[in-house]
Amino acid sequence: GINYEDRSEPFLGASGVTHPLLSEAVTQFQAQSYKEMLPSGGPVKTQVLGAPTQETEAQAQRVEDFMNYQITEIMEEYDPDTDQMLFYLPLTGSTFKKIYFDETKQRAVSKFVPAEDMVVPYSASDLRTAERVTHVVRMSYNDIRKLQIAGVYRDVELSETNDGEDEGAIKERSDELLGLRPNYSDDSYTLLECHIDLDLEGFEDKDMEGNSSGIMLPYIVTLDQSSGKVLSISRNFREQDPL
């Protein structure tokens, strides 16, 4: 129903009427989307392109069965992360999925990335053609240390944790709508994972004569936001990929 409360902000006598319409709409959207995107048999459906044969149909079925097994049984975070993403989507308008190979788990993982944690240039129209894509990653010291021991990140000393920094108006508003309120410090670090094109000395693109072409190549550069220290630079392309 409609609730009413006396308010003095932003001015005396301001309307204090509230109604859970947005919460109801979000819940309905989440429930309907979850049913469509995560059916009981698994989210993957395969289709044979071209004239189907018994062999290609059997191959497609094997791919479908394996992918659904991978997502529903092995990737334990896929279901709850997707469920959470579908709750955020109607509130923020955009959400992202990040699927990558996790060195500590030694398997593919699927992570929900809120819109406020994905930073692109203002002129970008999509992620594929954006000159730079930065994922704001919040990670505990223990998880960072695991990656340092595994050789993924440089073994360098990090600055003090920066979990108390402002996370932005979008995050604050979405937490307010969800009824969330942080009541403790999780001592997390903020890392910036930048997907960017670089022309690194000693790793230049070569032309047919073996000379540097001057073409920048895609890399992933991860750094600690607080100290500015680079933790890793990794190649984001295969040798056979087109320029």
Located regions from the model:
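Extended, helix-rich architectural segments
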Residues: 1-242
